[in-house]
Each structure stands twice: as C-alpha cells, then as structure tokens.
C-alpha cells in the first residue's frame, strides 16, 4: 500500500518552468528556456544549469518574482489528485529544483504536506544572481527521499514519485511506483507508469 507521494513542481504540479517565467520579465526567456531544456534532458549538469540560469536573473526585482510565483498556472488535476492521495492516508510532498517563493505559496493552494526547494538570494529588493538550498544537485531529490523514508518509516515499495526531467532520476531510484509525467525520454525509460496527457488525475487510474 502506498504511503508517500513525492511530486516535482515545475512541469509537473505546475504547467511550465518558474525560472522561465522570471526570465521572460528580463527579455531572456528563450536563452534561459534553452538551458532549462538541456538540463531536464540530461545533457547539462543540473547544478551548473541552475547557477547559470539564476545568474542571468541578477537585478530582477524581488517584487516581480513574488508576483509571478503567486500567479503560476497549476497543472490540470493537481489539487484534486493531491486531495485524493491524502484521503487514502498518504503523505504528499513536493521536491523542486526550483524556488521556495513558488513551492511554499503553492503548498497552501494545492494542499501538499511539505515542500523542499531552493532559495533565491535577495539584496536591496533585487535578485543577486545567487541561489542556495536543498535541491541544487542531480542527486538531491534521491538523497532527500531516502531521508524522508527513514524518518517516516516508509519503504521504497510504499513510495510513489512523479516527475518529468533528468533531475528526478535520483528519486526514481528509491521508489516502487515511478510516474513519468509528460516527461523527457531519459526519465520515461526508468518509469513504470507513463502519463502523456497534461492531467495528473490520470495517475489515480494507474495506482
């Protein structure tokens, strides 16, 4: 019986990439989006890509970051899927290589129990181009999942994970149910549940 569900945020619980929305404000959307795609497809190290992309955001007003973070388009069925999993007695957690401004705000709207993500450094009301946090490396999600499983006394077989990109691979290594959601090929190959339609409720039919 499943007891824990861990969802990625960008392009999984949320329909898009938070950092790409930020970049559009600075007129560098295409450049940042290209780096994001390289990282999510596994062609570029996630840590390097994160530093590179956040560096390009230097000088962006934090008020704009907050406004965008609070108006993101959530994925079809996100709220309903989380509510249903919780009604089955599961803990639902969000792991994101993105940013706390988005995941913490979404927590209250979508209803997951906890979020682990990264923090954008801010000085004098503007982004400094630096980032820190729990989810900065390719191995971060896997490491955090193992820690959570140990704390909660939950096994791999009792764990469901859901994501779309290469930085989700490490958590796929520690879960019995592995959902590739509208995912890159590198992740699809490691999944035992594949969803190709942008509606998270489809997962409920498959578990």
Where are these regions (language model features)?
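Alpha-helical substrate-recognition element adjacent to the catalytic core
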Residues: 1-119
